[in-house]
């Protein structure tokens, strides 16, 4: 177990920790190569409910075990994020979708075949195993398969999906430069993975697939017209 230093607030019955003065492990990686020793080190931190800042195909993300209420609460506290706002997750492959979502519509197969791996987050009905604190106490979950070799390898090695919230304080700009990520989060998280400057640009596009007709909740890297042709 980790020892927490900082202020504690109540988050719908869960303890949220604002970290201070932790020892942060910096791990520098080649995002195109999955070196087992590097990935294994970070995966072990996640399995122990650690918080990891990691590179993606868009910006840097803040990752914890999506099944651990205490780890999820740490992520909310670090971002100073409204606990009523849910966190999405990243998966390692298409098969992992069933560990986080149920009642998946048939249109899902067309969208994931066209746009995954890539910057598309699909909102689905959440698996009952997912803690309420991750979902903002709703019943849906955002899921993404990233176009990032190292990140997919990390999630596969960890053995569970991890949170995909951007590594920034609530209301602040997303981070694509690892130097900035270290400035913001060193001493506050257990590990920062330096995978170089990420692609940046736009965040992922978010599509709600929980209703009869899908709807775009946020237009991002994938333009709406490329998606709407699948259901209009």
What is each residue range found by the language model?
Residues 17-232:
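Active-site-adjacent structural elements in enzyme catalytic cores
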């Amino acid at each position: 177990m980790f020892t927490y230093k900082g202020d504690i607030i109540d988050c719908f019955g869960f303890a949220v920790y604002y970290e201070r003065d932790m020892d942060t492990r910096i791990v520098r990686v080649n995002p195109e190569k999955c070196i087992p020793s590097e990935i294994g080190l970070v995966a072990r931190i996640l399995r122990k409910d650690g918080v990891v800042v990691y590179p993606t195909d868009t910006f840097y993300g803040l990752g914890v075990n999506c099944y651990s209420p205490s780890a999820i609460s740490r992520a909310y506290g670090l971002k100073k994020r409204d606990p009523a706002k849910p966190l999405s997750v990243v998966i390692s492959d298409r098969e992992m979708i069933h560990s986080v979502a149920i009642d998946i519509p048939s249109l899902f197969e067309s969208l994931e075949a066209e746009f995954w791996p890539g910057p598309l987050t699909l909102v689905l009905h959440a698996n009952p195993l997912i803690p309420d604190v991750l979902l903002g106490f709703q019943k849906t979950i955002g899921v993404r398969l990233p176009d990032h070799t190292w990140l997919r390898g990390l999630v596969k090695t960890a053995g569970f999906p991890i949170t995909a919230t951007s590594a920034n304080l609530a209301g602040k700009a997303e981070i694509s430069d690892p130097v900035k990520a270290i400035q913001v989060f060193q001493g506050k998280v257990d590990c920062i993975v330096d995978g170089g400057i990420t692609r940046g640009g736009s965040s992922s596009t978010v599509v709600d697939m929980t209703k009869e007709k899908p709807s775009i909740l946020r237009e991002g890297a994938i333009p709406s017209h490329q998606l709407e042709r699948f259901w209009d």
